[in-house]
Amino acid sequence: MNDNPFTFDKFPVGTHERLINGYWELGMMRFHTYTNECGEDLQSTYNRINNGLGVQTIYIDLLSLVGEDYRNKSQIMDVIQSNKPTWIWFINCEALLNDSLAGWIRSILTTYDTDHIRVTFVLDNQEQYSNIFQCYSAPLYQSTMALDLQKS
């Protein structure tokens, strides 16, 4: 008798498939990574696995939101309201040094029903990570975990 409700364990340990399936099944929602560690090839692999699960993958350029009416109309809000499983890659994360934008992102990711969304903030460097996610006064303080970069 198998009491394990999860299916990700049918994939071999250390594989990208097990990792992505596990993130969805375990409800792990917000990640960060670095452009020099998670390049286009690895992102494409993660996108292919997500697509195989019926999950759409999109890229949102956070710099494109600066100065826009992002609070009332944005691709992020469309994704949240659609309830369609989606993996979002946030790029140009330096925009999150703007506390207003960062606070709004934190707010929508924590107050709306976002169980159908997984987000990855693609950062340029460790300093950017420290300023956005490790500064106690920053809106996104300690709100992510490192995206695992399985080398399968």
Where are the regions a protein language model picked out?
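Extended, compositionally biased accessory segments flanking or bridging domains
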Residues: M1-P85
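Hydrophobic/aromatic beta-strand patches that form the interior of the parallel beta-sheet core
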Residues: M29-H32, I58-I60, T120, Y141-L147
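A short acidic, amphipathic alpha-helical/loop segment
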Residues: S44-T45, S100-I108
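Catalytic-core regions built around general acid/base machinery
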Residues: W104-Y112, C135-P139
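Short, well-ordered coil/turn elements that cap or connect secondary structure elements
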Residues: G52, T114, P139-Q142
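A short helix-turn-beta junction within AAA+ P-loop NTPase domains corresponding to the substrate/partner-engaging
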Residues: N131-S152
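Short, charged/polar "capping" segments at the starts of alpha-helices
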Residues: E37-S44, N98-D99, E127-N131
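Conserved P-loop NTPase "ATPase switch" module shared by AAA+ and STAND
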Residues: D61-E68, N72-W104, R118-Q126
